[in-house]
């Protein structure tokens, strides 16, 4: 009986009638999370966290382990799918004013930070050339923190340079953090269902609601099928599309790659870091590029929730989206003109969106005299 009651509760979950496809990405993220944990477990069974054996163990997984190539590719490309879904999920939250549900937004931003940390630790594990140098550059930023920086870096490295203890630490962190992500995701969903989802109009959803099942379950399954089909097509036909050519070589501390860069989903933050010619300033800008999302619920001044009826903010939002892509593109280029200038302008415009948000809201209120 209890499970029947649970199913009944799930089926009768009241949801706004007019929520669009942009609201499907939450369930897609849940599927991505499950897929990553499952494939990650099978990879961890065969992986060896040792600087002399890590690279060979990845080759062993892809060549010798039955369906190891499939597990490895699903895990690597699944991470990219995860970030595509999460960036769309955040963009939808910004566009439709979902951030006004403060607790849900703050728990979601914390989830993003935890997810980025997990992905970064995972990128280092194959111990390829780019993995090693990306780890060296990014972890070295901790030394910019006054007083505690050097101690924190030494603690994270497990010595005075990146070595075997570093890889062991990163593997342990990459294994344990997903459990934190699962816990925080549960809290995120719990907080969301305290007040319920918003809708594209930004109005009170209580006026007209429908049961979650069957209307939204079918819609969710359709989007999940589309996502898994896309994932399997990339895994089957373009498995190396997101990989860096340098990462097919074993880590060599004596040879620096011509251009050090992290995975594509971190390039916007890395581009902001590189646009500032100062170590501490760059590290602060990097942290702020994510942390600034925490300020959004507190800087909303407009009387309207959704951007659907705010043409000025729509213009700002799409400029922000274009800026995000421009920073991602410039971060793949060498540190030389004109890329440095483009990167600096784009980074300024990135932060300008968050600064102009309250000003635009105040202006709109004045114009509409509401």
Curated annotation (Swiss-Prot):
Sequence intervals crossing the membrane = 25-45, 69-90, 105-125, 170-190, 218-238, 280-300, 312-332, 339-358
List, alphabetically, the Pfam families matched: Cytochrom_B_C, Cytochrome_B
- Where does the source fall among the domains of life? Eukaryota
Question: Where is heme b b566 annotated to bind?
Answer: 89, 188
According to its record, how does it sit in the membrane? Multi-pass membrane protein
Where does the UniProt entry say this protein principally localizes? mitochondrion
What Gene3D superfamilies does its record include? Cytochrome Bc1 Complex, Chain C (1.20.810.10)
Q: What residues does a ubiquinone bind to?
A: 193
The cofactor note reads: Binds 2 heme b groups non-covalently.
Report the cofactors.
Answer: heme b
Q: Which residues bind heme b b562?
A: 75, 174
Sorted keywords for this record are:
Electron transport, Heme, Iron, Membrane, Metal-binding, Mitochondrion, Mitochondrion inner membrane, Respiratory chain, Transmembrane, Transmembrane helix, Transport, Ubiquinone
Task: Provide one Gene Ontology cellular component.
Answer: mitochondrial inner membrane
PROSITE patterns from the UniProt entry = CYTB_CTER, CYTB_NTER
What Gene Ontology molecular-function terms does this entry list?
metal ion binding; ubiquinol-cytochrome-c reductase activity
Query: Which GO biological process categories is it annotated with?
Result: mitochondrial electron transport, ubiquinol to cytochrome c
What subcellular compartments does it reside in?
Mitochondrion inner membrane
Hey, which family's this protein in? Answer: Belongs to the cytochrome b family.
Q: What else is known?
A: Heme 1 (or BL or b562) is low-potential and absorbs at about 562 nm, and heme 2 (or BH or b566) is high-potential and absorbs at about 566 nm.
What biological function has been recorded for the protein in this entry? Component of the ubiquinol-cytochrome c reductase complex (complex III or cytochrome b-c1 complex) that is part of the mitochondrial respiratory chain. The b-c1 complex mediates electron transfer from ubiquinol to cytochrome c. Contributes to the generation of a proton gradient across the mitochondrial membrane that is then used for ATP synthesis.
Oligomeric state and partners?
Answer: The cytochrome bc1 complex contains 3 respiratory subunits (MT-CYB, CYC1 and UQCRFS1), 2 core proteins (UQCRC1 and UQCRC2) and probably 6 low-molecular weight proteins.
Q: What is this protein called?
A: Cytochrome b
Organism per entry: Epicrates cenchria
Its organism's taxonomic lineage begins at:
Eukaryota, Metazoa, Chordata, Craniata, Vertebrata
